[in-house]
Regions:
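A short LG(V/I)-centered, amphipathic sequence patch enriched
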Residues: 1-10
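Short amphipathic alpha-helical coupling segments at ligand-binding clamshell hinges
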Residues: 13, 17-20, 59, 153-154, ...
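Alpha-helical linker/hinge and terminal dimerization helices associated
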Residues: 17-39
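Interdomain hinge and pocket-entrance segments immediately C-terminal to HTH DNA-binding domains
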Residues: 36-55, 66-70, 114-115
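Flexible hinge/capping segments at coil-to-helix
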Residues: 40, 107-116, 120-142, 146
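Hydrophobic hinge/microswitch elements
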Residues: 78-91, 96-97, 148-205
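Beta-alpha-beta core module
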Residues: 102-109, 113-115, 176-224
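Secondary-structure junction motif
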Residues: 140-163, 227-235
Length: 243
């Protein structure tokens, strides 16, 4: 603890300890829920991290209609935090954009996919084009996700090392609309189209990459995890809906 004149704040180590304590409490609560869900009556809580797709949500609704004592908790955070919680067992599943680390996780491809492109000011020169090519991307200051796997995906598409891109800023999770970044003129926002609002503000526009770069969502879970009966039923229901 750091004691000030009027308040006490946590040190960096204290912040880490608090985060670990929160994870432990979450894991204890989940373990209690799992023990309940392994009774003959299917019940308990299923925890899902990341950005749930409509397929995942529809499956959750169907499972709830069959087993009303099953409940869901959705947890939104950056990829590192979600993977840590998946690793520690406080999450059953996570919804991620591919690529997936298949050495550590089992996964189920989901039908939802999206295309990569740039969010930009409507009045800029690049907005006059129907698409964004490699040359455009390399000449443009970018605001890009910090997840290494996604950066490698773009690097492979452009056949260019990520260090050679003009990356003005990176982010992990965006709260609210990303258009504020465009209006600030910090850079152009490299993202997938499905993460944008259904209706964009008139002074911004989205242009897809060319050649097109589509990416698919997947549900992932820890390969060695011991799943509750409720989680097993959810996964079974989801597999039936996507096959």
């Amino acid at each position: 603890l750091i004691r000030g004149k009027r308040k006490i704040t946590l040190t960096e180590d204290g912040i880490i300890l608090r985060k670990r304590a929160e994870e432990i409490l979450s894991l204890v609560e989940k373990t209690e829920s799992d023990l309940i869900s392994n009774t003959p009556l299917i019940s308990g809580e299923i925890t899902i991290g990341g950005n749930p797709t409509i397929t995942v949500l529809n499956t959750a609704a169907r499972l709830r209609s069959k087993y009303p004592d099953v409940h869901f908790q959705f947890y939104s955070s950056d990829a590192i935090d979600v993977l840590e919680r998946l690793e520690h067992g406080s999450l059953d599943f996570a919804v991620f954009l591919e690529p997936i680390d298949v050495a550590e996780y089992d996964y189920l491809p989901l039908p939802e996919s999206s295309c990569w492109g740039l969010l930009m000011p409507s009045g800029c020169e690049l907005a006059k084009k129907d698409y964004v090519d490699k040359t455009d991307l390399l000449e443009t200051p970018l605001i890009f996700h910090r997840r290494v796997g996604l950066q490698q995906l773009i690097s492979h598409w452009a056949d260019t090392a990520i260090k050679d891109f003009n990356i003005a800023a990176t982010y992990n999770v965006i709260n609210g609309s990303p258009t504020k970044f465009i209006k600030s003129r910090l850079g152009f926002y490299l993202t997938t189209e499905d993460l944008l609002p259904a209706v964009l503000e008139p002074d911004v526009c989205f242009r897809p990459l060319n050649p097109p770069l589509e990416i698919q969502y997947a549900l992932i879970w820890k390969r060695t995890a011991l799943q509750s009966k409720a989680a097993e039923m959810f996964l079974q229901e989801l597999k039936q809906s996507v096959t």
